[in-house]
């Protein structure tokens, strides 16, 4: 059912080079499910269906909008992991300074629509949701709550700093206070 595979990525690091590297799975003999990396609407639908059943313990016929939101979020996370691990591998292979930003709050806003846009699969997600009987992606996006990581302008400013660093491909990590 699963195909054994290695992922070859081209990552633009902070040195502005596009060097291919082989992103090996962490444990020999691990398997990567190709459906968890697929970007077409069928793969997104299959990922959502699998997360509804295996992660949330729901059938598609009894799934609420919140269940579909969670399933879509998990399916998007699966697809983001390839990029995340590729970034970590670039940093591991070419150690460089990392910016550490400390803030009492980060007001990052809803993330699902942003992640869909960054992956380029907004239309594919909407097509997958139509197969569940949801006519508009906005119906599911409205379910997402604002992460409670701040309450004002400084939190939004901290989030803007982090987004700018990411856009400039500067290795950065944000540290906050959990209260």
Q: Model-found features: residue ranges?
A:
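Flexible, polar/acidic helix-loop-strand segments at domain edges
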Residues: 1
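Polybasic, lysine-rich low-complexity intrinsically disordered segments
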Residues: 4-5
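A conserved ligand/cofactor-binding region detector
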Residues: 12-179
């Amino acid at each position: 059912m699963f195909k054994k595979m290695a992922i070859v990525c081209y990552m633009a690091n902070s040195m502005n080079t596009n060097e291919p590297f082989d992103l090996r799975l962490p444990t020999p003999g691990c398997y990567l499910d190709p459906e968890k990396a697929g970007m077409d609407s069928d793969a997104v639908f299959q990922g959502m269906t699998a997360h509804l059943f295996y992660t949330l313990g729901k059938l598609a016929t009894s799934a609420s909008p919140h269940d579909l939101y969670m399933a879509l979020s998990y399916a998007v996370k699966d697809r983001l992991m390839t990029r995340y691990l590729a970034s970590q591998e670039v940093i591991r292979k070419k150690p460089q300074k990392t910016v550490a930003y400390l803030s009492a709050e980060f007001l990052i806003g809803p993330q699902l629509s942003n992640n869909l846009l960054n992956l380029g699969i907004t239309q594919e997600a909407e097509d997958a949701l139509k197969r569940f009987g949801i006519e508009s992606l906005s119906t599911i996006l409205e379910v997402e709550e604002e992460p409670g990581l701040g309450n004002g302008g400084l939190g939004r400013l901290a989030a803007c700093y982090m987004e700018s660093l990411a856009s400039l491909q500067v290795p950065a990590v944000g540290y906050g206070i959990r209260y």
